[in-house]
Each structure stands twice: as structure tokens, then as C-alpha cells.
Amino acid sequence: MELLVDIFGYLSIILHGITIVAQSMTLGGILFLVFLVRPFMHLLPQGAELERRIAKLTIWSAIGLILAEVAGVGLQVAVVKSTVDLSFLDVMQAPFAIAGTIKILCALLLIPCLSQRMSTGLVGAALPLLIGAAELTAATFTTHAFARLDNNVLLLFVEGLHQFGAAIWIGAIPCFVLALSKLHDANAWRIVGARFSRMSMIGVASIIISGSVMCVYYIGDIPGFYGTAYGVMVGAKIAMFLALLLLGLGNLMVTERLRKNQDTSVIRLRRFAEVEIGIGFTIFFAAASLTSVPPAVDLTADRVTLHEIAVRNAPAWPRLTSPDHDQLAISEMQAQLDKDAGLRHQAAGQAIVPGSGVLPPRNADDIAWSEYNHHWAGIFVMVIGLLALLNRAGVGWLKHWPLLFLLMAGFLLVRSDPEVWPMGQEGFWVAWRDVEVAQHRFFVALIILFGVFEWAVRTGRLRSPKAALVFPLLVSVGGAMLLTHSHQISNVKDQLLIELTHTPLALAGVASGWARWLELRLPGRGGRIAGWVWPCCFMLVGVILLWYREA
């Protein structure tokens, strides 16, 4: 069990992200039902059916929340029990376990409350809201605010306001998309669009106010933004939040046109809302990643300066030649262990045990090896983006460009982790205990999947419109997961300088995925523009990778 603590730590971030998504959808569904569907149900031609569908979606979100919380709390309990000599009952008295248990109970209570038998009357409205408020309160006790010694009450309230804003806006968008798809009347679209716009404005205001307060108390100053991992991740959240505001503004304009002209198409409203869901959920995973790092105000030492950022990112020619595998630090350490064991006529031990928590040694050749990998990956992505642009421009025979993803995946599988099979001594399966190896393999699997699907779609082997959506979805997932990617480097500054490169990579990946989604789903000029945007985002990813430095 001790050898799995690192991988469990990473899985806990992923589970926390899923928990935030499920919680926001659950609370958003309650608010959408209580403040939009039920008050206007008599004005909507399919009001009763819409209420049933929204309630069903909210119930499934609550079930997802239960499963995510059970898995998350169970994982944390297992890790604590394996590292500290405490009984199960003792661990379950910890604040995270109590808060998780309350959230599970609240989600369980919501399921019968959202059934049709309890959907009418004052009780049908008040009870889900009260249970949702209890759920939200418990959720705030798993945030940084609970651990603060100063301004604890204020920050707990602010955290609650922040999560409320995310729920009433982002968490309710799936309900909004469902409503638009089930309603077929222009007047109904106008009512739902106008009401949800007001709900979204409340959410935006809540997020801006609470986010501003948290920036003051958790980041403190401008150097905290660019000089700490917490500040960099908050910056990524702000960038995606601004993208959501632009999409929301576009939808508000459609809603206003719909109010003046009932013949206005709502297709853009639906497609932009779909992208808002994707970017919003990515923000939730960034928020989950924030829980694994201390607030910037607590990290006064080892901050990265602007000078260090400028030096690290100074222009330099890409590294196109690789050092020998035998020159890497782990290879040299293993060779020395083998030599010493041979002199003693004993079996040699492993230089590094996967999952042991011991950070691997690094030397200049390790840095060169990593830079070589990133730079050649950048060349792959640059070429892919260029070929996709040329194919978009009408060069039909370039439709096979997605096959380059398979070459890139093979390159990364072999080179990303030199201490692991096939180049190193660590076995293929045992290396899964290493969190960085597991993340690299996950990305390789994603690259293979979206490469195969996109090639099959472009060559006509897969003709289903749903198959075409696999590529943008997986690209977006890859970008979101890159926000949670970690490196096993002991030097805090070096780790942050690497993260400063990976964060824009993630944002460009998310942008490219959802731009491709719009190309496929949005008819007319908007879709055509998106078709040119996403290959450019790929080329931007390539440029960033070619710019990558570790020293």
C-alpha cells in the first residue's frame, strides 16, 4: 500500500474534480428547477416533460456525486490508514471524512425530494433548496478556507459564494442545453433564455466578488500570481473564465435578438452553451488541482522571479540530438549498484523503486533528454497543425495527417520515461505505481485514440457524426488533464518554471478541442472560422513545446 501513495494522491485530485462537477450539476439542477422550470411551467408547451427531464438529470448528478464522494473519501481514508497508525473510526472523525459523509447523505436525500411525488408545493421547492444549502456548506469545509487561522469565517462564506456562483451558472448549463433541445417553441426559448441569463449574471457576479476576495487573501500580491504554482493555476482559471464570459455574451446577444424577433435561430445558443460546459468543467478540474498546493501567501520563499522566467524562456535553438541512455542519472546509479553488487557477489538492488515517494536523481543529461522529447513533440504537433490547415484549405490528399499522432504516441511511449521498459530496467506493469509514468501513459493513450478516430472520420471509415466528436472531446480532456500534470522534481522553482510552460499548453489544447467542436456543430460562418482556429492552436502548442526549457 505504501508504494501506491503517490498514485493515490494524483487520483484524489481527479476524483475531487469529478466531485466538483457532480456537485455543481446537482446544485445547478436544483436551482434551475426551482427558479426557472417550475415558476414558468404553465407558460412552456412541454413544461411537465421538461421538469421530469431536468429532475432526472439532477438525480443522476446526485448519484454521480455520491459515487465520487464515496471513492474520494475511501481513497483518502485508505491513504491515511496506510501511513498513520489510526483505526477506521478515528480516521472517519477527520474533517474531510465528516464533510464527505454529510455530502453523501445530502445527495441521498435529494433523490426522493426530486421525484415527481414531492415536486409540487412549498415543500417541493424549499426542501431541495435546504438540502442543497447543507451540501454546499459541507463542501466549503473541504477548501483552503477551513484550514486558515485568520479570517476563517469570512473565507468560508466567500468559498461558499464562489461555489454557489459556479453552480447557478456553469452547473446549470447542462439543464439549459437540455431545455433548448426539448422545447420547440420560439416563445419558450425566449422565456428560458431570458431567465437563465439572469441566473447566469448572478453566478458571474458571485464568482467575481468571491474570486476577488480570495485573490487578496490567498495570493496577496502580483508576484504571488506568477511566482507560485497556486497563482499560476488561478491565472489559468481566470483565462478560462474570460472565455466563458465571451461565450456568455454571445448567448446574451442571441437571447436579445430572440426577444425582438421570434424567428431567430437558437442553434448558436445551444452550441456556445455546449462549449461553456466543456470549459466550465475544465475550470473545475483546475480548482481541484488548486487544493493540492498551498495558497501563494503561505509560500514566501522559493518564489520564481520575473528575471528567472525571462532567462528560462530566452530564445534558443531546439535540442534535436539526444544524450545516450547510459548517461542518465538513474542509469549511472544502476550501473554503480550492479558493479558494487558484483564485487560482493550479491543481487543488485533497484536504483529507484516506483511509487516509493523517493524523487529520482537528475543530471544535465536528464534535462537534455527531456528537452529533446519536448522539442521533437513540438515538431510533430507543428507539422500536424500545418497539415490540418492545408487539408482545410483544400489539399485533399493530406486527409491522412492524423496518422502522425500514432508516430508521436510511439515516440512518447518509448522516450517519456527512460527508466521504464523498453529502455529501462523497470517492468511495464510495476511502473504504473509511478504517478508521472501513469500520467504519461494516459496522454499517450489519448493521443492514439483521437488520432485513430480522426483518421477514420476523415477517410470515411467512420461516418457517424458522433464519431467525429471523439477527437475534439479527447483533445479537450487532454488539455484539462495537463492542468493536473505533475513532475517529480525536488527543486520547487524548477518545477514551477516547467508548470509555467505546461499551463499555456493546456489552455491551447482546450481551445483547440472546443474550436474543432464548434467547426463540427456550428453551421455557417462561425463554424468555418472555428475550422481555421483549431489548427492554429495546434501550431501554437508546437511553438510552446519548441520553446520548452528545463535549464
Language model: regions and residue ranges:
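Polytopic transmembrane helical bundles with strong interfacial aromatic enrichment
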Residues: 1-368, 390-401, 451, 455-460, ...
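Short, solvent-exposed interaction modules
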Residues: 427-456, 505-514, 518
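Helix-loop junctions on the outward
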Residues: 71-87, 414-435
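Membrane-helix interface and helix-disruption motif detector
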Residues: 225-227, 367-371, 393-398, 423-442, ...
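Alpha-helical transmembrane segments and their helix-helix packing motifs
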Residues: 112, 407-420, 432, 460, ...
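A motif-centric signal for short, conserved binding hotspots located
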Residues: 475-486, 509-515
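Structural signature of hydrophobic alpha-helical transmembrane segments
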Residues: 96-104, 128, 372-379, 439-445, ...
